[in-house]
Structures are given as structure tokens and as C-alpha cells.
């Protein structure tokens, strides 16, 4: 037993009788502990070192013969923490020094004397409750190691109790440590000792309460079950989780619960389970904000994903796995050649090194010289290392955490300047890829938002993004299709961006794609005057309209009579009158000809007080207009100064915004057309227009004058001309959208299929926005015909045509008067066709065949065209309308199966909608593809892919576009429209078949694939070639010669 002695403290000499802390009398021990607390508060942090406190505590804890020594050592720790000396004690107890008492305190959890064990747990709890939360990372490794490896169940149970206290005292820090916590706790739940098992379960339940992700809160109990009972629960939990849409940030607590499930799920046998795991991994990884969050799980998760992608049989599931791999590689910054298991260790900040930095910085900022070994300074270095290693560079956190401990070493020194400089240095080292530009602080701020989020429905678009806009700047908003460019613009105008200035402070105007079709009858002037938001007088409005090309006559015209280009100019005129601070322009060059694009560039660059945000896929326009680029990528918004060329220097991988290069992994594929009856070369005309004139009903001006032209499989036509010159009208006549009304004739091959995408491409899907692309396709082609064809002018009967058909429906056969009911079937008749006709009130046995010319003469031309279309479908043009085939078709246009089958079209971006329209138009394997302004909503990557696909297409191509780069890269023939007149150049119009290569029989070509009723390909037996008499004689002669040589040879007859 230690000798009794009176407590004596001398702050001047730095002495204290430590033996008094370990005496048998508890009251005396308590009095000595209080005296020590008073002494150290007066003398400072180095007092513990001067009196040899740590050595004495460790010696007492290891004194197996003295219960009072062991109990007293634990009690004095609690007394110091409870009496205001905790901050002075921390640097000595929580450090990496060899003589720290903390390991000995943990070993005391297994003391045979219950009082000592209780005192030890109370002491550690007191330390944990009073210490700085960032010290948790110093204590945690020792606790987890004991839970995992200790042979004494009391130590395990006690450590688990301390962990529970840590979760209460330092929730954020323990959340960050969850990747280390969860595996240890999941293992401890299966301990053989029931006390440990019970404590581990309670600790795990408390730990998972740190998960604050709203997406998975309701699944936490299921996730815990899958950790504890993986064989039974993993498949169930994966099914539950696969239906979840992740929109909240995925942090360390969330991923530490989900990652073990994914790792185990990839070891399951069913392909469906593996696919679900890949979907979860992909969706979850997109919302991980830092590589450090996902790094602990990469060595196990990524190799399994790679193995799944290489071994799984289902190609669609393989593509999902590959997508997840790409996302994980990007988030974790894993090189292509690595599978994540051989990554170099992350840099680790060391406490002593940062303490050395503090010594230098204190001296630099006018402080007195201080030893690096000073406990307060050394401990500040340890805490700074914890902050750096967990990537916390928040100024408030650093300023509240470190100065109190630096003050222990330098009581009269203001350490804030030194702390801030070290913070800046470490933050710069950690964020080398997030360069700031020197002009960041120049100019007047219109908007400066930090840390905002943006989602569209269930899809996250921006996460913790920043946006700073300067007055007079022109920002080009760049990003891939579907990255959220138009959604961000809509969110700004609808006041849905948190922190964006309200309309009362900053006037913002959105120049939209198109003008509402419901206002088609309103005159242009009245439409502009009716807008109450415009700060302009009627005179100003008229003069502004004149300045953009609307003279007095045009101002009185209805909006419905305007072409796409003029509608866009009208929307821009309204934007000018709005006098906005911020102008949002979404594809402003759509439908504009070259002269109007130049006018727009001059107008935008002349604005000095107005800021513009521009979304455009016209790289030349952006290059000549913008002063900065806002890059929307990986859920962030990053500003780069300069135009598009300068931006590409900073971000080389964004070259696709500037150059029309086809990416190897991103290509479109157009289905090649089948053969047509009577068409033996690509030069033979399939579509003709002869002396056609046209004028819209109600219009005072004729649109087309005496147009003659023809189109064949070899045609590559660019239809050019200024806005309003009749380009779209010409194409509508060719495709049957409208019909000639001032004379002339349009002829097309009976079996010809045309794939048409209109100028306002979205009108094809406007009434189906709440359907998925799959549902839209199933609706459009449900009868085997294209239901959009049914609404074309050349399929709708006029009153005059109905009267003519009624008059011509009477047929006299064998003296009996019959009335034609329907056209039933068709067959070849010389150079034309004849049609089987049924009669009203008569059986099918009475049907007769009538030639095409006679039926046309009787007024049945549109009925003939209807049957021709049906027959064209039947003759092999039709494809099985099943989900797998539709998904594969859209995949050829860069649209994933996820969007085709599971996303409504309302939620798709403009570029994705264009891909749906293109895919739907080409489903029937058209012979001629007709595209009216196809480049409007496609990004550069998709545009390059479309150009390559059109070049390889075996059919004819007609393109209306103002994009010269696009037309020149494809087209060899030009139809120039000028005020309704056509000037054709570069064409090769022939009568008959022409002299080109024959396409009706190509050497080595197999017959076209035919399908049965279930959509399965029919494998035809190969025809055997019959031998001629000469061949038979030659074979016989050969057999005789071989027999003569002694070989055994038999013919089929002999066998």
C-alpha cells in the first residue's frame, strides 16, 4: 500500500506528491485529485510533464498488488475531467506517446476487482465526453483493435460501451469513421459471449442512426439484417434497394452500410441480382462527393464489378455493369489499367510534422519561440492532422478547434493568423485540381451562390455546386445531353435555385425554344403588346420589331404564319424589350439563317450591362460570343474564362463541344432499307415532283412556284435558303404532310417508306410526354402501320375526294351493279399492280381484281396508298414490336435501355427527346430519311455520330439546315430555295434505272431475315445446287481414277 502523505503543490517549482493519489483512503484520494486539478490549472499544461504524471498513472494501473493504486489512477482521471482540467489533461492522455495511460486504462476494463473496472470505464468515458471531438480518430484504432482481437470479453464489452459514448459525443466524426466501425461491429455481433454480443448489437444500432440519407432511412433495418444474416437477407435487401432513386448526397455512413451489401450481392449467382447491384452501385456512386468516401471499398467492390462485366451472359446486364465500373473509376480516380486493389495509399498528415509547421508560422506571425515538444503545441498538431486526413478545410472548424490548444503553449499569443495560413496551405495542397482564376473577383456580382443542389424529378443534376455571375459577361453553358442545362435555366426563371436573386432585384428573361401554338391566330404586334412584363411603350415595341426585320406589314401577320426562324427572332425581340439584367438563351440560333446568326452575335456582344447565359450546340456561334464557359459536369458547375477554344485548353476532354469527332464508344447506327420492287440501282427515282405550285390557305403570298425534282437512294440533298423561303413547305409536300393545291404532281414508289423528323421535332411526341419511349413506340406501331401516317394530308380524305370515290365506287359485273367496299390485297401486274376489291353485301368469293390506274381514275388513290403502305410493312419491312428489339433499336441512337423503358419522355433532355424522335422515325427501316433542322438540340458528340451514321446509310437523305458544317459534311446535292423558286445543283437525275451499280442482287448477300409471329428469326434451309450432266460425268471420272489408285469411294446412289 502506498504511504500516506499530505498533498503539497508548488506551482513555482512544478512539484506534486503523486503518491497521495493512490492511497487506500478514498476521501484522501479525492482531496489529492482536486488539489492536482487546482495546481495544473495554475501552472499550465507542462505541469503534468514536470511531475511525471503519465509514468505514475501507468505504473499504478499495472500494480497488480494494490487495488487502491489502480482505482486511484482511474479516479484521478475522472476528477481532472470533471473539475475543469480536461483540456490540460488531453495532450497527455490522448497522444501517440509511448507512456500515454490510455492503453492501460482500456486493459483495466478486465480488472478482477469490480470497483477498478467500473472506475476505469468511468475514467475513459469522462475523457471521451470532455475531449475535442476531432481527437476521436486518435482513440478509435485502439478501441477497434481490442474489440477485434482481445481475448478478454470484459475489454470487448467495455470498449463497445466507450464506442457508444463516442457516437453520442462526436457524431460527425464517428460518421466519418463508419467504414472502419461497421465491419468490426458486424463481426462482434457473432461473439461467443452473450454480453459482448448484446453490447455489439446495441452499438451497431446506435451507429446506424448516424445515417441521415433520406433515400435509405427506411431501409436501414433491412441493411442491418443483411449485415448480420447475409445468406438469407442480401437478395431481399438488394431487391428493396434497387427500386430506390438516389437524390441525396451519399456520405461515409451511408456507403459503409450499402457497400458490404453490394460486395456480397456480386457474389450471388442469379444474373438479376448482379444487375440490380450494378444499378445501385452506379446510381449511388454518382452522388458520392469525394474519392476519399469511396476509396475504402474500391479494393473489394471494383474487382468484383469487373469480373461480373466479363462473365455475365446477359449483354444488357453487362452494359449496366460496365456503366457502374466507369462511374466508380471516375469517382475514385482509378486508372483504366487498375482494378482498384493496387491503388497507392492516400497521403497521411502526421501530427509532429504539422506541429513543426506551427512553430514556423508562430515565429513568422510575431510570436515567441516555442518548443515543438510542448504538449499543447504537439497536441494541436495531432488535431490538425485529424482535420487534414478527413479533408475538413472549413475555416470555422479550424478556428474553433486549434487555437485553445495553441493557447496552452502560448498563453498571450493570438494564434488565429497562423491557423488560417496553415489551413490555406493544406486546402491548396488538397484541391490542386480546383484551380481559381485571377479574374474571379473582378467586376460587379449579379449572383453569387455557394453550395446549391438541383434535381429534376428523381434525377440529381447539380450537387453542392457554386454559381457566380458578373454583369456584362456572356456565359456559355456547356455539358452533355441530359446533364441539366435546360433544367438549370428553367429552375432559374422559376425561382427554384436556392440563393438566386429574386426578380425584384435582378430581372431575368428566358428566350424559349418556341412560341405557344395556342396563340397562332394572334397578330405579331398584339402578341408583343399583350405581354405586361415589358417595360416599353407601343412606339418602342414597333421600332424594336422593325429593327429585327418585322416591318409594318409583317407585324399584322399572325404568329402561326411565321417560320421557325422568324418565331425565334420574335422571341428575341421580346427579350430586348424586357430590358433584362440576365438573359437566358436556350439554342438561340435554332432555325436562324447565317445573316440572322450574325445579327444575333452583334446584338449580344453589344450588351454591356446585361449578362447572358447561352446554351447552344453551334460551336462557331459560342466561340464568337461568350466571354466565359460554365461547364456542367459531374454534378458541378465550374467557370472557365475565355471562349470555347480557351475552355478546351483547360478541359481537353471537352473537345467534343468544339470538334465534330466521332467517339469510338458513342456512335449512331441507322437501319439499312430493304430492296424495292423494280429498283435495281441507287440512281432510280423513288420520289418525284413535277411542276408543283403551292399556297397556304389564308396566306396572301404563294409559297412555291413550278417545282420539279426527284429523289433516289443515292440522294444526299441539302435544302438551303433564308428563313421563310419555303424549305419546310417543299419537304412537307414531298413527305405527304401537305398536298399541292395550285397544280403539279407528287409521285412516290408504292412501297417507299420515308422517315421524317419535322422542324419542331418534339411535335411528334408532344401528346405522349407522360409515356416512356417504349410505350410511345408500342402505341405508334401497334397496328403494324405508323399511326402518324394516318394523319398526313395524303391519307385524309377531303369532301371532293369522298364525292369522287362515291361516284366511282359503282362497278357493273355480269349485268349486276356492285358497290366497292374495301381494297383487300395487291399483286404485281406488269409494270404496276392490281388490287383485290370487295363489294358491299357480297361474300369474298365475289371479289375481283382491278388495276391500279382504274382505281385511281375512280377516285380511290388514297385507299390505294393506304394498302400500299400496309403491303410495304408486310413485305419484310416490319420488325417484331417487342421490348428487346425496341431497346436495341434506340441503343443504336445512344439512348440507354434505362431511359427507353423506365423514364417518361417529360423527364428527358432536349437531346434525348431528339434521339427518341429519330429512333421512332427510322423504326420502319426507311428508304429515305428527311430531317428538318436536325441539329437544333443535339450536342456536338451526337451531331458527329449522326453525320457518320448518315454517311453510311444505304438510302437517300434530305436535310434542311442552316448548319453549313453539318450539310457540307454529308450532302453532294443542293436545293437552294429563293422566294419559292428552286435552284438545284450537284444532282444526278436519271430516267429509268440509270447506269449505277446494281443493288437488286449483290454477290454473297444472304436473304433478308424473316420473323415468325413471336418475333423469332426464321432460319431457312440452304438450297443445294443441282449438278449438270457435265459435272456428273466429271465426278464419275474422278471416282474411277481414285478407285484405280486403291481408294474406297462411293457415289450417293451406290450407298
Curated annotation (Swiss-Prot):
Localization in the cell: Cytoplasm, Cytosol
Reactions accelerated catalytically: ATP + H2O = ADP + phosphate + H(+)
UniProt HEAT repeat ranges: 45-86, 96-133, 135-172, 175-213, 217-255, 257-290, 295-337
Pathway stated in the Swiss-Prot or TrEMBL entry: Protein biosynthesis; polypeptide chain elongation
EC number: 3.6.4.-
Family recorded in the similarity comment: Belongs to the ABC transporter superfamily. ABCF family. EF3 subfamily.
Binding site for ADP: 45, 723, 933, 936, 962
Feature: compositional bias, Basic residues: 1033-1044
Protein name in UniProt: Elongation factor 3
Gene name as annotated: TEF3
ABC transporter domain segment(s): 447-659, 687-1004
Amino acid at each position: 500500500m502506498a504511504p500516506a502523505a499530505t498533498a503539497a503543490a508548488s506551482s513555482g517549482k512544478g512539484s506534486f506528491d503523486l503518491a497521495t493519489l493512490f492511497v487506500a483512503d478514498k476521501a484522501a484520494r479525492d482531496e489529492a485529485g482536486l488539489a492536482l486539478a487546482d495546481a495544473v490549472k495554475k501552472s499550465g499544461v507542462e505541469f503534468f510533464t514536470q511531475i511525471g504524471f503519465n509514468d505514475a498513472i501507468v505504473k499504478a494501473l499495472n500494480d497488480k498488488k494494490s487495488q487502491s493504486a489502480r482505482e486511484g489512477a482511474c479516479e484521478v482521471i475522472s476528477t481532472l475531467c470533471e473539475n475543469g482540467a480536461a483540456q490540460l489533461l488531453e495532450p497527455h492522455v490522448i497522444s501517440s506517446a509511448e507512456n500515454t495511460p490510455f492503453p492501460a486504462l482500456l486493459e483495466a476494463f478486465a480488472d478482477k476487482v469490480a470497483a477498478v473496472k467500473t472506475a476505469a470505464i468511468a475514467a475513459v468515458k469522462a475523457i471521451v465526453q470532455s475531449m475535442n471531438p476531432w481527437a476521436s480518430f486518435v482513440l478509435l484504432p485502439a478501441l477497434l483493435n481490442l474489440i477485434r482481437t482481445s481475448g478478454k470479453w470484459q475489454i470487448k464489452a467495455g470498449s463497445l460501451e466507450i464506442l457508444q459514448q463516442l457516437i453520442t459525443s462526436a457524431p460527425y466524426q464517428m460518421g466519418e469513421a463508419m467504414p472502419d466501425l461497421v465491419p468490426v461491429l458486424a463481426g462482434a455481433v457473432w461473439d461467443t459471449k452473450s454480453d459482448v454480443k448484446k453490447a455489439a448489437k446495441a452499438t451497431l444500432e446506435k451507429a446506424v442512426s448516424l445515417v441521415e440519407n433520406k433515400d435509405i432511412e427506411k431501409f436501414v433495418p433491412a441493411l442491418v439484417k443483411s449485415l448480420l444474416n447475409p445468406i438469407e437477407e442480401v437478395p431481399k435487401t438488394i431487391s428493396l434497394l434497387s427500386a430506390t432513386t438516389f437524390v441525396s448526397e451519399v456520405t461515409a455512413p451511408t456507403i459503409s452500410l450499402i457497400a458490404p451489401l453490394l460486395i456480397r450481392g456480386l457474389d450471388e449467382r442469379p444474373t438479376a441480382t448482379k444487375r440490380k447491384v450494378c444499378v445501385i452501385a452506379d446510381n449511388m456512386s454518382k452522388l458520392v462527393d469525394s474519392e476519399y468516401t469511396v476509396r475504402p471499398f474500391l479494393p473489394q467492390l471494383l474487382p468484383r464489378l469487373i469480373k461480373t462485366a466479363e462473365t455475365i451472359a446477359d449483354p444488357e446486364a453487362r452494359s449496366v455493369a460496365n456503366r457502374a465500373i466507369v462511374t466508380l473509376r471516375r469517382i475514385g480516380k482509378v486508372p483504366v489499367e487498375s482494378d482498384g486493389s493496387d491503388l497507392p495509399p492516400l497521403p497521411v498528415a502526421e501530427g509532429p510534422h504539422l506541429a513543426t509547421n506551427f512553430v514556423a508560422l508562430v515565429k513568422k506571425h510575431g510570436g515567441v519561440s516555442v518548443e515543438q515538444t510542448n504538449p499543447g503545441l504537439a497536441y494541436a498538431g495531432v488535431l490538425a492532422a485529424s482535420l487534414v486526413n478527413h479533408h475538413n478545410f472549413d475555416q470555422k472548424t479550424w478556428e474553433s478547434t486549434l487555437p485553445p490548444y495553441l493557447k496552452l503553449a502560448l498563453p498571450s499569443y493570438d494564434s488565429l493568423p497562423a491557423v488560417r495560413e496553415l489551413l490555406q496551405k493544406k486546402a491548396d495542397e488538397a484541391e490542386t485540381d480546383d484551380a481559381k482564376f485571377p479574374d474571379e473577383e473582378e467586376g460587379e456580382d449579379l449572383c453569387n451562390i455557394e453550395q446549391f443542389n438541383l434535381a429534376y424529378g428523381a434525377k440529381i443534376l447539380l450537387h453542392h455546386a457554386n454559381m457566380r455571375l458578373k454583369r456584362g459577361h456572356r456565359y456559355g453553358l456547356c455539358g452533355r445531353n441530359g446533364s441539366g442545362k435546360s433544367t438549370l435555366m428553367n429552375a432559374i426563371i422559376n425561382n427554384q435555385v436556392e440563393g438566386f436573386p429574386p426578380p425584384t432585384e435582378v430581372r431575368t428573361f428566358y428566350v424559349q425554344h418556341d412560341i405557344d401554338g395556342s396563340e397562332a391566330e394572334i397578330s405579331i404586334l398584339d402578341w408583343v403588346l399583350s405581354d405586361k412584363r415589358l417595360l416599353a411603350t407601343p412606339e418602342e415595341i414597333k421600332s424594336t420589331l422593325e429593327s429585327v426585320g418585322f416591318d409594318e406589314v409583317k407585324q399584322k401577320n399572325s404568329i402561326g404564319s411565321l417560320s421557325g426562324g422568324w418565331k425565334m427572332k420574335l422571341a428575341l425581340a421580346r427579350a430586348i424589350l424586357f430590358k433584362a439584367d440576365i438573359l437566358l438563351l436556350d439554342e438561340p440560333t435554332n432555325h436562324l439563317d447565317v445573316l440572322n446568326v450574325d445579327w444575333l452575335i452583334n446584338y449580344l456582344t453589344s450588351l454591356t450591362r446585361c449578362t447572358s447565359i447561352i446554351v447552344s450546340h453551334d460551336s462557331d456561334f459560342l466561340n464568337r460570343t461568350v466571354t466565359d464557359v460554365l461547364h456542367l459536369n459531374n454534378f458541378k458547375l465550374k467557370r472557365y474564362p475565355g471562349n470555347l477554344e480557351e475552355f478546351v485548353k483547360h478541359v481537353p476532354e471537352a473537345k467534343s463541344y468544339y470538334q465534330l469527332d466521332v467517339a469510338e464508344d458513342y456512335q449512331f447506327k441507322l437501319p439499312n432499307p430493304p430492296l424495292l420492287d423494280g429498283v435495281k440501282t441507287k440512281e432510280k427515282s423513288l420520289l418525284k415532283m413535277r411542276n408543283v405550285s403551292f399556297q397556304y390557305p389564308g396566306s396572301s403570298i404563294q409559297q412555291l412556284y413550278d417545282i420539279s425534282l426527284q429523289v433516289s437512294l443515292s440522294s444526299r440533298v441539302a435544302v438551303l435558303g433564308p428563313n421563310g423561303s419555303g424549305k419546310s413547305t417543299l419537304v412537307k409536300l414531298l413527305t405527304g404532310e401537305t398536298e399541292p393545291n395550285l397544280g403539279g404532281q407528287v409521285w412516290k414508289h408504292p412501297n417507299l417508306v420515308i422517315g421524317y423528323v419535322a422542324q419542331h421535332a418534339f411535335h411528334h411526341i408532344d401528346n405522349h410526354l407522360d409515356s416512356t419511349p417504349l410505350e410511345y413506340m408500342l402505341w405508334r406501331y401497334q397496328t403494324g402501320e405508323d399511326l402518324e401516317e394516318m394523319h398526313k394530308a395524303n391519307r385524309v380524305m377531303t369532301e371532293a375526294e369522298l364525292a369522287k370515290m362515291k361516284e366511282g365506287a359503282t362497278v357493273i359485273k355480269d349485268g349486276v351493279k356492285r358497290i366497292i367496299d374495301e381494297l383487300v390485297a395487291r399483286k404485281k401486274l406488269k409494270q404496276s399492280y392490281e388490287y383485290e376489291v370487295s363489294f358491299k353485301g357480297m361474300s369474298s368469293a365475289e371479289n375481283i381484281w382491278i388495276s391500279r390506274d382504274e382505281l385511281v381514275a375512280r377516285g380511290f388513290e388514297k385507299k390505294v396508298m393506304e394498302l400500299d403502305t400496309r403491303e410495304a410493312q408486310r413485305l419484310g419491312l416490319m420488325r417484331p414490336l417487342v421490348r428487346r428489339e425496341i431497346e436495341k433499336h434506340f441503343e443504336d441512337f445512344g439512348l440507354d435501355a434505362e431511359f427507353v423503358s423506365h423514364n417518361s419522355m417529360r423527364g428527358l433532355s432536349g437531346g434525348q427527346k431528339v434521339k427518341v424522335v429519330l429512333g421512332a422515325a427510322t423504326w420502319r427501316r426507311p428508304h429515305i430519311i428527311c430531317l428538318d433542322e436536325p441539329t437544333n438540340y443535339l450536342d456536338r458528340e451526337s451531331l458527329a455520330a449522326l453525320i457518320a451514321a448518315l454517311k453510311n446509310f444505304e438510302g437517300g437523305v434530305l436535310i434542311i439546315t442552316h448548319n453549313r458544317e453539318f450539310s457540307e459534311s454529308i450532302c453532294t446535292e443542293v436545293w437552294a430555295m429563293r422566294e419559292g423558286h428552286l435552284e438545284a445543283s450537284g444532282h444526278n437525275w436519271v430516267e429509268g434505272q440509270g447506269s449505277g451499280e446494281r443493288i437488286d442482287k449483290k454477290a454473297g448477300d444472304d436473304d433478308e431475315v424473316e420473323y415468325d409471329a413471336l418475333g423469332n428469326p426464321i432460319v431457312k434451309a440452304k438450297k443445294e445446287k443441282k449438278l449438270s450432266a457435265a459435272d456428273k460425268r466429271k465426278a464419275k471420272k474422278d471416282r474411277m481414277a481414285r478407285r484405280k489408285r486403291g481408294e474406297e469411294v462411293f457415289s450417293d446412289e451406290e450407298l
